[in-house]
Amino acid sequence: VYPRISPVPTLSWAVRDLGCSGGVCVTASHNPAAYNGYKAYGPDGCQITSEAAAAISTAIEDTDIFSGVKSVDFDAALAKGDVTWIDDAVLERYYDAVLSKSVSNLSADEVAKAPLKLVYSPLNGTGLVPVTTVLERAGVTDITVVPEQRDPDGNFPTCPYPNPEIREAMQKGIELCERVHPDLLLATDPDADRVGVAVKDGEDYLLLTGNEMGVLLLDY
């Protein structure tokens, strides 16, 4: 169990890193807050298949919710060792793995000599700490975070549909860009497994599609 709110990718990583049978993340993802639910992951760290989901649904339907659901006192389970907290060493291994997969061959010091100026928004979700940590370790330190969307808030007060691939969710970030003039606007959805990118295009900002980002990365 993570002791704090954490993004989906860190859960997926921990399942494999710790050799778990599966993982569950409670999240509304990039959907409106009313759609809060959970994502389930298999032992490979990937989201479960439709076949596995169907089997789980059947098991739930066959369970008597009044007498068939097992429960345990959380503190007692911690004391017994049946439940354990995920420590920071797991996160450090995750950060190292992400940085090792960077498409850039530049060191952090080399990146810092040609600084990249970013505006970033976690869209009131979980991305702030891991995203800024990885960027800063990669040498990108000039990061301005959208203040209204900095802190976690499961009600998503600044945009009811926090999908960074749509302009409505990026609007606060675009407004900040017009004041601080960054090279790039980045935003992650609330559980930080989806990214949106916007770049200056004349007097406006252009949102890149996933296909466009993929082509740019491939070309680089």
Where are these regions (language model features)?
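N-terminal small/polar loop signature for handling phosphorylated ligands or for N-terminal nucleophile
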Residues: 1-35, 137-197
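Short glycine/threonine-rich loop-to-helix capping motif typified by GTGT followed
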Residues: 13-17, 126-133, 199, 206
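Short, hydrophobic alpha-helix immediately C-terminal to the catalytic nucleophile
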Residues: 12, 132, 215-219
